[in-house]
Design a protein with these regions (language model features):
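A structural signal for multi-pass alpha-helical bundles of membrane permease subunits
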Residues: 1-222
């Protein structure tokens, strides 16, 4: 019964919404974080160290501190009520954790490879896509797992910005089973809660080998 959803909106719709948000946001995180990490690790420019320190400091800020300013900003942009606040910011490397992780991995790659590529006439873009990117695959897969799971389980952001039931992700749709004004359907709620963790579990078990490899290699190189 839980799969039937609410108000003619099936639970499959909520699953599709969560998959869309999680996959697109994860892609944005990987693309932006890897590019920024490469720039901080390999490119020399004024203020690089200050930018790196600022990124580390941003990791220490609780997300709740930024919620009100972010909401007001997204409201001015007209993004409230859409998926834009849940997706677009991740294309700008807003999560320092992934930048730091990938940057540490890139630091472990011998710079002699870059120098040899420059002698052959490669630009920074060629070095990144042809040399660095294939070598940081374990770090990218590790980041994929963490990013997907965090986006899939994100409840508070969806609660702030999504105001239509048809756009609810799974994390937000589950609360619809809990009705404080009447009896809650606990059977359906537990069944859907169990199904809701399946995508993250499947991804974790399929990529577990790469996750362990990425963490162990990052630890050795860091």
């Amino acid at each position: 019964n839980g799969w039937k959803g609410f108000a003619k909106i099936t639970f499959a719709t909520f699953f599709k919404n969560s998959l869309f948000i999680s996959i697109v946001a994860t892609m944005g995180t990987l693309i932006s974080s890897s590019l920024v990490a490469f720039g901080l690790s390999r490119c020399k420019f004024f203020g690089r160290r200050a930018l790196f320190v600022a990124m580390l400091l941003s990791m220490m800020l609780p997300a709740q501190v930024l919620m009100i300013p972010q909401y007001l900003w997204y409201q001015k942009l007209g993004w409230v009520g859409s998926y834009k606040p849940l997706i677009i910011p991740y294309f700008f490397a807003i999560q320092g954790f992934f930048v730091y992780q990938i940057s540490n991995f890139i630091d472990g790659i011998p710079r002699e490879l870059d120098e040899a590529a420059k002698i052959d006439g490669c630009s920074y873009y060629s070095i990144f896509f042809r040399i660095v990117l294939p070598l940081i695959t374990p770090a990218l897969i590790t980041s994929t797992i963490f990013s997907f799971m965090w986006r899939w389980d994100d409840f508070l952001s969806a609660l702030l910005y999504i105001n239509e039931s048809a756009k609810y992700p799974v994390s937000l749709a589950l609360k619809l089973f809990c009705d404080p004004g009447s009896s809650s359907d606990y059977g359906a709620m537990f069944a859907m809660a169990t199904l809701s963790i399946m995508p993250a579990m499947i991804m974790f078990f399929c990529l577990q080998k790469y996750l362990v490899e990425g963490i162990s290699t990052s630890g050795l190189k860091g």
